Amino acid sequence: MNLPNLSLADFLPLLPAIIMVVGASILLLSEVFLSTTASRAYQAVLTVVTAVAAGAMALTTMFEPPQEVMLGFGVMDPFSSFLTFVVCVGLGLATLSSVSFLRKRGAERGEFYALMLFASAGMSLLAMSNELITLFVNIEVLSLSTYALTSYLRRGTRPSEAGFKYFILGAFSSAVLLYGAALLYGATGTTHLTAMAGPLSTAMSSQPGLVYAGIILVITGFAFKVAAVPFHMWTPDVYEGAPTPVTALMSVGVKAAAFAAMVRVFFMVGKGVDPQMLLGLFSVLAFLTMVAGNLLAIPQRNVKRMLAYSSIAHAGYLLVGVAALFVTGPGEQFRLLGASALTGGTPLGLARAEALRGILYYLLAYTFSAVGAFAIVSVLERREDEEKGTAWDLERFSGLAQRKPGWAFAMAAFMLSLGGIPPTIGFMSKLLIFQAAVDAGLIGLTIVGVLSSAVGIYYYLRVVVYMFMRPVPEGAQALEKSWSTELALVLSTAAVVILGIIPGPIMGWLEQASSIFGQ
């Protein structure tokens, strides 16, 4: 039997994920030696250091030429490196916000941070996946970790209920995705994405039904992971029931990894099938997700559920960018939702690169804004009110500007960014997405996106009004200081404001990460 010939060079591109797995293993071993609350603080420090090291390692590979690793089952390129960096940013900020959250509940244990690292390693590997079975395995690595994290808190029924719902629906969606992958394998005879285009083109002539069924099932599986309508039903309950720092990591990390895998899979698949079908499917998903997410968020007084529906809406904006990847160039006419020919003679490769650049920038912007917002939510909630469902009521934010001006300013920045209001990073990210859609000729979809974004501003500004224009509630308890949470807020707020005003520092990274579509 011939064994695969693996060398050290095959593992070097995997260093970010390896660093996270090693860090998680050290945390699990540390449980044997650490027993006091003070000593457990070092577990959070180790997690943050691991996230920084993995993120820095990902950045060092940003400008390396693309190369297949692990016998072609993965690919290291600027695209996967940037997504790994985004995941590490979300991991580090979510870890900082979890320290005081866990301490107040007496739940500081090494396995919490270890699961965060295992989930993030799965996200990183998912962004690199270049083969369908490897992709499925990495989805399960991150999913199993997030299932456990969702039900981590053992007091009350909400975490257990949320974890159970997430597990059942997540397992169902994984089965759907795997079935779709099996159909694509049956049509092409390969599971490697880079080798799939030619056989798919042939299969479209002989057995188109099999190909279409496989594509639709794979899209359905991904749609669940990114919380796209109508596969979003799990999101509000799971986001509400999970520990708030876990909700923060899920909302940004899972979304980033799933979109990375979705883009890579369908960029390769799109070379062998009619791109008009993919354009139509993703346009419909984007339309439904933007509209439903924003409309369902309006009546919410539970801020955690409001942010959950907001997350759905943001998935819709990202799907606009995904749809723009499948406009095939001048002379093609797509009328769905107002799509027309590629405008202005924009070169096809440039149009796709613009769309991908918008997606990547949006994921980074959403990471800083959403994790920061959930960090504020985590420090305002009280453990005794969680089971009653009042821990995340909008009234918690009343008079926050008088009690904690710094926190109120940070939350206002996050809300403005999520709403896409200048001069925040959220405005720049939406501008890039919608500009790419306009350049691709998706005029109707862009109009729907802009109008949906305008609707979303209402419920974001409502939080700001409560913080700055409502009095402090009678009997309001003093708010505890948390150095780790405040550090996360400072970093997130600085990124939201500075990168909104001066986006130049990361534009070089975005240009490099989107270059795989510039050919």
Curated annotation (Swiss-Prot):
- Recite the UniProt keywords alphabetically: Cell inner membrane, Cell membrane, Membrane, NAD, Quinone, Translocase, Transmembrane, Transmembrane helix, Transport, Ubiquinone
Q: Name one GO biological process term.
A: ATP synthesis coupled electron transport
Q: Which reaction does it catalyse?
A: a quinone + NADH + 5 H(+)(in) = a quinol + NAD(+) + 4 H(+)(out)
Q: How does the entry describe its membrane topology? A: Multi-pass membrane protein
Disulphide bonds in the chain: none
Report the main location listed first in the record. membrane
Which Pfam family, any one, appears in the UniProt record? Proton_antipo_M
Taken from the UniProt entry, a GO cellular component term is:
plasma membrane
What is its subcellular localisation? Cell inner membrane
Can the keyword Transport be found in this entry's annotation? yes
The source's superkingdom equals: Bacteria
Q: Which GO terms describe its molecular function?
A: NADH dehydrogenase (ubiquinone) activity; NADH:ubiquinone reductase (non-electrogenic) activity; quinone binding
Q: Where are the transmembrane segments?
A: 14-34, 44-64, 82-102, 117-137, 167-187, 209-229, 249-269, 278-298, 307-327, 359-379, 407-427, 431-451, 487-507
EC code? 7.1.1.-
Query: What InterPro entries does the database record attribute to this sequence?
Result: NADH-Q_OxRdtase_suN/2, ND/Mrp_TM
Which family does the similarity line name? Answer: Belongs to the complex I subunit 2 family.
Q: What does this protein do?
A: NDH-1 shuttles electrons from NADH, via FMN and iron-sulfur (Fe-S) centers, to quinones in the respiratory chain. The immediate electron acceptor for the enzyme in this species is believed to be ubiquinone. Couples the redox reaction to proton translocation (for every two electrons transferred, four hydrogen ions are translocated across the cytoplasmic membrane), and thus conserves the redox energy in a proton gradient.
Q: How does it assemble?
A: NDH-1 is composed of 14 different subunits. Subunits NuoA, H, J, K, L, M, N constitute the membrane sector of the complex.
Name of this chain's protein? NADH-quinone oxidoreductase subunit N
Q: Which gene encodes it?
A: nuoN
